[in-house]
């Protein structure tokens, strides 16, 4: 009897995910976390890139009153693993994005592959890559925000921890806040698992109401790290102006 082998490439691992369940979770609760996709050695290799020169810009969060920590945007070309994950995550998320647009009575504007979407970004003057590494030490945090860099924006994005909560750092939970019209804000506090991708809205998502779907505004941030070093990889699909 033939034996099945585990997917070896990042793209194969992403393709093998239970996308039916993940899409349902995104539709119902607005976020979903995959099982681990990146292996421990891959996470360590990405984290080690933080101190090299492959970045187009560095942001000190305190200086800009974004929180306490540091992040760096990768330069082009992206590291192979980051580029592979970005391209593999995009198609199933584009299906979700188009479904959300239809629920809100809009056209389904997102092409099926990332290259076509990036061409749209570039035509709008958004040519700088946006995947990034983020690092926090004890006391580090990130205030609530949205990752928008121009008129063209993809409705979903992804983040993964590159080290282990409870072992390499404490605190630092991912915080996702939704503001529904004429209602109090609701916070989702999520523990990131190393190598697993949390999928979540960039700016808004549809929620079903008594008169059809309506928009709820989303923002995200990071709770205070109480000990250790927390590192994450963020994958944003639209480029920046």
Feature map (PLM): residue ranges:
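Fe(II)/2-oxoglutarate
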Residues: 1-28
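Non-heme Fe(II)/2-oxoglutarate
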Residues: 21-118
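A short glycine-rich, His/Asp/Glu-containing loop-to-beta-strand
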Residues: 32, 126-138
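Generic detector of contiguous secondary-structure segments
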Residues: 77-87, 119, 138-141, 154-155, ...
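A structural signal for short, well-ordered beta-strand segments
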Residues: 131-133, 158-160, 233-237
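Short, conserved beta-strand element in jelly-roll/cupin
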Residues: 135-137, 151-168
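Histidine-centered catalytic micro-motifs
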Residues: 142-149
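Catalytic core of Fe(II)/2-oxoglutarate
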Residues: 154, 165, 169-241
